Amino acid sequence: METHPLNLAHQQHRRADAHLKNSKFDEAMQCHHNAAELLLDAMKTTSSTAALESITLQHSYHLKQKDLIKSKKEQYTRVKKAMENIKTLSKDPQINTQGIADAHGG
């Protein structure tokens, strides 16, 4: 039962959550991809309409999560770059002096 595709998909979901908490976006996206693929395999193991509907919704969820994480990764990259730029600018004495002069009408 532990190797059933549905259980493995749930493991991949938990793994994706752990990766996301550590800002490992590519790994999280891969886990959601794996979960979605495993759910397709799980669909082949049942003929229950209710089970198929549930698995289909879960499959859709994992595909959407991949897209959402991709957006989060892009946003994280932009924010990180902006923070690095601010840090670099704050170390430049000419910019700091100019900023002080501008602030005092100078």
Report each predicted region and the residues it spans:
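Non-globular sequence segments
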Residues: 1-106
